[in-house]
């Protein structure tokens, strides 16, 4: 990705929350009074609130496992700190945060004396400007940074930055940045003020970088005043119940976008292409055996892909069976709309050696038929893991085999840049989510 140079119109400045609007007005007043080329003007595009808890980086820092910045970037330092904590506490070592690890970190943190709960790691939330967001020229970015302490105060910092566009160097289109820090309880108390900071007559986005919680006042306040709630289901700790929550919110008439859905695009595209030839398209109705492999820890991608496939082929979910075992096997049985045929789908969580930043990525898909004469067998697999397991299912020579190239843009903030260009509702996502919801409601 090409780097976008950014000019600081005003570097972060600490102020009281009551001074936010007046301080921002001062920035532009100063610019108007001393106007020389290049001219800086405020963008008139959209506002976005980013809820960035980063609880586990803070817990790891307080417990002395993590020495890096609190920045939301789950890179090598963060993964190594998680591994060290998991080894220290006798947990399964994965280098990823799961529910058991997070629960243990919280327990250990609560046992610390107040003086031990402090840490010196730089908190860069709200300061590490995402190029992907900056390139969309937002009008105002408001970052909410919950802290672990019980302090009742909320601190504020404001700044303004201007991406330098090569096509137009005489004018700078600039964005206001507001960062609010405080405990969860204190941020809850100022939720009304946060909503008022979003520019009234412009589109309003909320990027909720956590599990959606309709029982949380701050979530409800921001959600009610936004045009679009953006989530990333790869963050979800209990995928099944949380996808159900997302479906309930969608049914209420609110627009939700899931960044994890974008990660499925190459898989969907290759699946569709596999059945473009007329003779293969006619054999689609013969598919009655499906295998979907994904990385352990989060089944959101697998469930959404299955929701997409089943909704396109008009399958009706009938039964859901948890078989468990080393791969956490789950089976879903559908009824076809043509001929009342039964379709069996197997979802498996397959451990991989090279885990990436995103939890639960798809690694393999096999579509086939019990009718050996049907030309419908298709195998898709990640180029990083290969097709061996899927081909071992038999009949590989009669299958169309495709490798899915690794996506360089899988990081959430980069996908967000794409989402901010698409302000309309995604009907395909909504229909796929609705089908995934139907499947999950069959869970025993």
Where are the regions a protein language model picked out?
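Coiled-coil-based assembly segments and adjacent low-complexity tails used as scaffolding interfaces
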Residues: 1, 44-48, 62, 74, ...
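C-terminal structured domains
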Residues: 1-25, 32, 38, 111, ...
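Short acidic, glycine/serine/threonine-rich helix-capping segments at coil-helix boundaries
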Residues: 13-17, 25-36, 41-112
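Conserved aromatic-histidine-acidic binding/catalytic patches
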Residues: 48, 117, 121, 185, ...
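Short, hydrophobic/amphipathic alpha-helical patches that form generic packing surfaces
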Residues: 55, 61-62, 128-135, 269-273, ...
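Short, surface-exposed connector motifs at secondary-structure boundaries
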Residues: 64-66, 199-204, 286-287
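Extended, well-ordered protein cores
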Residues: 127, 131-281, 378-444
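ATP/pyrophosphate-binding catalytic subdomain of soluble kinases
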Residues: 264-333
């Amino acid at each position: 990705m090409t780097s976008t140079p950014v000019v600081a119109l005003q570097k972060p400045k600490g102020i009281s929350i009551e001074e936010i609007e007046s301080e921002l007005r001062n920035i532009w007043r100063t610019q108007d009074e001393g106007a020389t080329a290049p001219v800086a003007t405020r963008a008139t595009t959209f506002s976005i609130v980013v809820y960035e808890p980063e609880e586990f980086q803070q817990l790891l820092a307080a417990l002395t496992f993590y020495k890096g910045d609190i920045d939301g970037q789950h890179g090598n330092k963060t993964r190594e700190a998680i591994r060290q904590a998991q080894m220290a506490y006798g947990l399964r070592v994965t280098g990823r945060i799961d529910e058991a690890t997070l629960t243990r970190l919280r327990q250990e943190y609560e046992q610390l004396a107040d003086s031990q709960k402090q840490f010196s790691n730089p908190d860069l939330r709200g300061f590490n400007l995402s190029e992907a967001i900056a390139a969309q020229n937002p009008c105002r970015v408001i970052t909410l940074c919950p802290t672990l302490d019980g302090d009742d105060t909320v601190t504020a910092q404001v700044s303004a930055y201007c991406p330098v566009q090569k096509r137009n160097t005489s004018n700078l289109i600039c964005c206001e940045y507001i960062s609010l820090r405080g405990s969860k309880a204190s941020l809850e108390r100022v939720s009304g003020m946060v909503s008022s900071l979003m520019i009234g007559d412009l589109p309003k986005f909320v990027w909720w970088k956590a599990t959606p919680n309709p029982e949380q006042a701050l979530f409800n306040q921001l959600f009610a005043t936004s045009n679009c709630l953006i989530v990333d289901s790869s963050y979800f700790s209990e995928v099944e119940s949380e996808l159900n929550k997302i479906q309930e919110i969608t049914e209420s008439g609110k627009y939700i976008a899931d960044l994890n859905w974008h990660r499925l695009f190459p898989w969907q595209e290759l699946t569709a292409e596999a059945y473009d030839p007329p003779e293969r398209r006619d054999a689609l109705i013969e598919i009655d055996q499906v295998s979907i492999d994904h990385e352990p820890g989060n089944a959101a991608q697998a469930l959404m892909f299955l929701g997409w496939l089943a909704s396109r082929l008009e399958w009706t979910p009938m039964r859901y069976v948890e078989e468990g075992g080393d791969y956490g096997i789950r089976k879903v049985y559908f009824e076809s709309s043509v001929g009342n045929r039964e379709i069996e789908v197997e979802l498996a969580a397959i451990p991989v050696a090279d885990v990436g930043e995103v939890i639960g990525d798809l690694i393999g898909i096999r579509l086939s038929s019990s009718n050996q004469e049907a030309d419908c067998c298709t195998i898709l697999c990640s180029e990083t893991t290969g097709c061996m397991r899927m081909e071992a299912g038999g009949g590989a020579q009669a299958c169309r085999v495709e490798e899915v190239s690794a996506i360089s843009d899988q990081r959430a903030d980069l996908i967000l840049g794409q989402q901010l260009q698409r302000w309309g509702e995604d009907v395909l996502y909504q229909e796929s989510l609705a089908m995934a919801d139907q499947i999950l409601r069959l869970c025993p």
